[in-house]
């Protein structure tokens, strides 16, 4: 994985963990959890591309893998919608910067996962 992506994930997660949004901390904690899961999934998918044994294993369980991939894209879409929703409501510049960066990162990760998935198919 690109070291900039790792740094971006860590930076955004650290910033989000310090925030107290007006909506609720439960929503923010849910977003943080989803970001962490997405990072782990993206890392494991990238590592699978580097190991041929894992690549063949993924191809052998193709139906399950496609369902997992579909679920991850749903999670990404949910996170994008949540970031956009927060951006429309907040006037705090720290929150705006954080969620704009989170939105950009989500779009980059979605693109990377699509690229990996096309290579695995």
UniProtKB/Swiss-Prot annotation:
Does the keyword Transmembrane belong to this entry? Answer: no
DNA-binding among the record's keywords? no
Which SUPFAM superfamilies does this one have?
A: Nonstructural protein ns2, Nep, M1-binding domain
The entry's cellular-component GO terms read: host cell nucleus; virion component
Q: Which domain of life is it from?
A: Viruses
Localized where?
A: Virion; Host nucleus
Instruction: Name the residue ranges of motif: Nuclear export signal.
Output: 12-21, 85-94
Q: Keywords in alphabetical order, please.
A: Host nucleus, Host-virus interaction, Transport, Virion
Q: Which InterPro entries match?
A: Flu_NS2
Any one Gene Ontology BP term = exit of virus from host cell nucleus through nuclear pore
Q: Which family does it belong to?
A: Belongs to the influenza viruses NEP family.
Subunit details: Interacts with protein M1. May interact with host nucleoporin RAB/HRB and exportin XPO1/CRM1.
Q: What the protein does? A: Mediates the nuclear export of encapsidated genomic RNAs (ribonucleoproteins, RNPs). Acts as an adapter between viral RNPs complexes and the nuclear export machinery of the cell. Possesses no intrinsic RNA-binding activity, but includes a C-terminal M1-binding domain. This domain is believed to allow recognition of RNPs bound to the protein M1.
Question: This protein is called what?
Answer: Nuclear export protein
Q: Which organism is it from?
A: Influenza A virus (strain A/Goose/Guangdong/1/1996 H5N1 genotype Gs/Gd)
């Amino acid at each position: 994985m690109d070291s900039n992506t790792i740094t971006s994930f860590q930076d955004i997660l650290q910033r989000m963990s310090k925030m107290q949004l007006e909506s609720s901390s439960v929503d923010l904690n849910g977003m943080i959890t989803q970001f962490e899961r997405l990072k782990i999934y993206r890392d494991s998918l990238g590592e699978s591309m580097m190991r041929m044994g894992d690549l063949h294993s993924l191809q052998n369980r193709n139906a399950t893998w496609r369902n997992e991939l579909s679920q991850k894209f749903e999670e990404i879409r949910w996170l994008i919608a949540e970031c956009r929703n927060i951006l429309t409501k907040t006037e705090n510049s720290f929150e705006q910067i954080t969620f704009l960066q989170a939105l950009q990162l989500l779009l980059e990760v979605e693109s990377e996962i699509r690229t990996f998935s096309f290579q695995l198919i």
